[in-house]
Amino acid sequence: MADGPRCKRRKQANPRRNNVTNYNTVVETNSDSDDEDKLHIVEEESVTDAADCEGVPEDDLPTDQTVLPGRSSEREGNAKNCWEDDRKEGQEILGPEAQADEAGCTVKDDECESDAENEQNHDPNVEEFLQQQDTAVIFPEAPEEDQRQGTPEASGHDENGTPDAFSQLLTCPYCDRGYKRFTSLKEHIKYRHEKNEDNFSCSLCSYTFAYRTQLERHMTSHKSGRDQRHVTQSGCNRKFKCTECGKAFKYKHHLKEHLRIHSGEKPYECPNCKKRFSHSGSYSSHISSKKCISLIPVNGRPRTGLKTSQCSSPSLSASPGSPTRPQIRQKIENKPLQEQLSVNQIKTEPVDYEFKPIVVASGINCSTPLQNGVFTGGGPLQATSSPQGMVQAVVLPTVGLVSPISINLSDIQNVLKVAVDGNVIRQVLENNQANLASKEQETINASPIQQGGHSVISAISLPLVDQDGTTKIIINYSLEQPSQLQVVPQNLKKENPVATNSCKSEKLPEDLTVKSEKDKSFEGGVNDSTCLLCDDCPGDINALPELKHYDLKQPTQPPPLPAAEAEKPESSVSSATGDGNLSPSQPPLKNLLSLLKAYYALNAQPSAEELSKIADSVNLPLDVVKKWFEKMQAGQISVQSSEPSSPEPGKVNIPAKNNDQPQSANANEPQDSTVNLQSPLKMTNSPVLPVGSTTNGSRSSTPSPSPLNLSSSRNTQGYLYTAEGAQEEPQVEPLDLSLPKQQGELLERSTITSVYQNSVYSVQEEPLNLSCAKKEPQKDSCVTDSEPVVNVIPPSANPINIAIPTVTAQLPTIVAIADQNSVPCLRALAANKQTILIPQVAYTYSTTVSPAVQEPPLKVIQPNGNQDERQDTSSEGVSNVEDQNDSDSTPPKKKMRKTENGMYACDLCDKIFQKSSSLLRHKYEHTGKRPHECGICKKAFKHKHHLIEHMRLHSGEKPYQCDKCGKRFSHSGSYSQHMNHRYSYCKREAEERDSTEQEEAGPEILSNEHVGARASPSQGDSDERESLTREEDEDSEKEEEEEDKEMEELQEEKECEKPQGDEEEEEEEEEVEEEEVEEAENEGEEAKTEGLMKDDRAESQASSLGQKVGESSEQVSEEKTNEA
């Protein structure tokens, strides 16, 4: 019967227990809590045993007992004091385990039996305590009051209460940590808060530790979780810590690469897929894996079945967001690009081209594939009028049309601005942006079909990457209106030709920025010119049809067009010049001059055989070419243009010689010429694609084996000189590539067809290094020297060309022919097409160099007009090329530009180096070039020492050896890693092995021999075996010395006992025996050395030798004993 009530009483006691706890709290609040905590510590003996119990009454008792002196007056009578004394004695008898059991019984409802068993020992006291506990319930304090003093453990108790609630009773006065048992609290205070000289205390939380390692481990608890993990892993060996996330690294360069994760910098870009990387390791692995190599056209021929991705084509107004592929960076001078592409746009740039509706001028209908398969690769061209911002882009590889895409001319503008580092083109673009925008608005308002009539199929190649890593853009443009395009066999519609006058006046509708004054300037400027090829040429434009330059006796060349006139639409020029009379097989004079000057730049003094080849390539008589070279050598024709540069980028300063040409025309033209310079960039009608800019920008283009490099001098006019002669601008600004009259007829053919189909001209046998040399105008010629010598050093792979028909009439079309054996754009030049190469990556390399380019001294005319000799091949040439690409106005002799403090700065990123060689090696990171190739496995490396270490894999050489474990390494890196991480481990291993060997080693030679024989096969390395044999030899020598001493002692004894004759016999016998022993030892040593190479044979030999030595020693000892 007692069990039931006991259980019920116990049940009811649980909530009261919380109240009791609160009661204690209330009482303690009346006194100083610190004093009470100290009192806990002071009364150790009386409180410890009572506090050890976790039961309800037991845990309450210690607190009441300690607080008793302060509240004895509040209690009624001394009965509780007496009971407490008795209860204390009972608890002492029980011990902590029984008390714990009792506590568990009081908490749980279903353990009444155990409660009853405990009750047998303490029934009276428990009942008395329960009565006292009932009286304590009268205090109404909330349970939360006491929880404030406990630890979070108490927060988990349920309504009925759990043992965790008792931890609130015993709280550490130093750190507020709660304990269920007072002994635990004492130990906690003793080991964590008592300070002495031997302890190590935490400066943050006053914890003390007996060992420093404990303190260090504890200090990690004050750090963030990431720091804790890092410290435990690294063992405090990582000195370089990231300030952003706290991650630490052993090496500084690892930290530098890690910081790029926070900054978002990704300096490494794949030339193939344009993917960017922040770590050089991931970039190198990406390059070596060649995952994106399949996306790259081979030899300029796109692979079939390529996925096509869409290239965004926003309207002209949205030019900043166009995803062109140039590598953009701010130059050291921090010249801001007008419209920089964001990093994200560069990253997400599409690799391939997607089929998109082809927008062609209304007058052109390419509904059927061209004869030569030009359009076979892509769908039929649709003659639809396009919005102003859209320009058709047709990939024109050597074989056929690949995916046509839409390109915004603003993209081209961005490309040119990036490629052209000169201030002039940038200023021109900035100054005329508003004008162009207004013009573009007009064109948008104009009838699309009419605009189509003025547009010409323009070709612009997207950034192209050849097999050799060359990245480029080829712009081949013509100013011819579609109306003048002839019907070519390729099913192109021929538009009705327009009269010359109408072309001049009407050809520039609303969208054209060229003013009517250009006609005047044209008329004024066409008077004086001198032919570069011959001395006497007709001075009249009408004589152009008669100008074929196959006869030296022909009259003087017709006067060149003024720059402004050259910028005018090609139709007017062609109409005026009667270009239509020229046969398609006759290359324009300007193109011929470009070729000749390119040859001259390659070799100023060609041999007769070379001259004949040049004459064949340019379709000119040998004597004409020879005479031209003589004039160039004599200085009559200057490669460099001495014309003054125009102060304003927009204006075209015509030489003073052209007094006929009104300067007002220039004043009126600034916008026009500027537009012309810009026009390719900005969909403006003006035809001028600044080759000069491109050539200037073709700093990016390099004389290295990269494809067409139109490096032109500053004063070089961008527009190529044609027979009709375009006015050359003496300006520093980008070259005006407006097509002169003579090209009009061939321009009538679609640019694509004229380039591909009209490749009537002989294929160039060798790529021309058409470095744009500055041209000095003849006293009568304003234009002749304007043509840039295109620096054409084609790579092994031919460029892919993209034809872009423009809605606006004047956008120069760009098409380049990519024959494997010919210079890609020379055919376009010969076909009256202006060709521009805008290298997107300044650092382009080709694996093969054509014979013409192989001539070591290559004089390249820098955009600033300075000539410099440099090797066409070798890594130095690469660095020169790279610097040339980036030479803004500095002399080219500084191959790599120095900053103000004499450092070498990378032009593709912001890194600066002290040595030019360091910069050159750094450039490999951008280009992906690995110049050091293994001759055995063809693996290439950026650094020579990497190749040296790689060669050791083939040779088996391992020059690095651990002095502890004897392991050898071929690479210094693996050796360093072993020494840093395993050195101590392998040291212990060696010591253990030595100790075991010493234990196994016996005092006799035989045992040593066997030990050596057993150890040798177990050794994985020859060095380990050598160390073992040395130790064995030392042991054997000691034993031999001991044996010799024993033998000497025996001999002395025998000498005392035996006669002299016997002594002599014994001496002879001993000598013989010693010789045998020595021979055996020598044989043993030889066997040991052989055993190092062949373990099995060494073991057998060692055992046999050991037997021999043992037998000989036994014989000697037996004979000596017998004699004794």
From Swiss-Prot:
| Regions of compositional bias (Acidic residues) in chain numbering | 44-62, 1031-1052, 1062-1084
Modified positions (Phosphothreonine) are 702
* Residue location of crosslink Glycyl lysine isopeptide (Lys-Gly) (interchain with G-Cter in SUMO): 347, 774
Q: Which domain of life is it from?
A: Eukaryota
Q: Zinc finger (C2H2-type) locations?
A: 170-193, 200-222, 240-262, 268-292, 904-926, 932-954, 960-981
What family is reported?
A: Belongs to the delta-EF1/ZFH-1 C2H2-type zinc-finger family.
Name of this chain's protein: Zinc finger E-box-binding homeobox 1
